[in-house]
Regions:
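Helix-to-loop junctions at the C-terminal end of transmembrane segments
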Residues: 91-105
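Transmembrane alpha-helical segments of major facilitator superfamily
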Residues: 80-89, 174
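Helix-loop boundary and gating motifs at the non-cytosolic
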Residues: 43-51, 55-68, 72-74, 78
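Intracellular juxtamembrane helix-capping segments at the cytosolic ends
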Residues: 145-158
Length: 187
């Protein structure tokens, strides 16, 4: 490792060295006061809608798992399910990032959605706590691959000076879908 690593001064409590890159200065809004374009980036909407789809579906898992396991008398298995689900997301992220960088988004999205859909299908057939637990890795890997790929594509779809608004657009759709989906699918 080099002595001149860019993080070295930051870790030592010193400011990082100045870079020669020019920063993009945000453009002045053409609207006075409040306008929806301050919060929503239209170019990011297709990917935000994909995030909405996966978030809505994920919210069904959040609602269904505890209820179903409790009805089987195996409520304690819910903790194991969500621990495995989260572990698969954590494990998948660095691997998914490298594959995304090398091969592009399509392989990540198709594989992620395929695993997530397979997990949902198996979950729909599951009649034992162990079968439900078996779906956690499939759902976790699928969600852990597809969700950040959609987020990255939402951000990349807009001009760099709108990256923050693109991020907000994506997470607005994701948050709405998880919140609304939990209510709608629990009915």
């Amino acid at each position: 490792h080099s002595q001149n690593h860019p993080l070295r001064p930051t870790i030592a409590g010193q400011p990082p060295p100045a870079e020669s890159k020019e920063l993009a200065v945000p453009k002045q809004s053409k609207y006075k006061g409040w306008h929806i374009s301050q919060f929503i980036e239209n170019k990011s909407l297709p990917w935000a809608l994909m995030g909405l789809f996966i978030g809505f579906t994920y919210s069904g898992v959040l609602v269904f798992i505890p209820i179903e396991l409790n009805s089987m008398g195996a409520g304690i298995w819910g903790s194991a399910f969500f621990a495995i689900f989260a572990l698969m997301i954590i494990i998948s992220r660095p691997i998914v990032g490298k594959i995304y960088a090398r091969y592009g988004s399509k392989i990540i999205i198709y594989t992620g959605l395929g695993l997530f859909i397979l997990g949902l299908f198996v979950l729909g057939l599951a009649i034992t706590p162990l079968a439900i637990l078996f779906t956690a890795p499939l759902l976790g890997l699928g969600y852990g691959a597809a969700q950040p790929a959609f987020q990255a594509l939402a951000i990349q779809s807009a001009p760099i000076e709108r990256a923050g608004v693109s991020t907000a657009t994506y997470f607005l759709a994701l948050d709405i879908s998880v919140g609304a989906g939990s209510v709608i699918l629990a009915l």
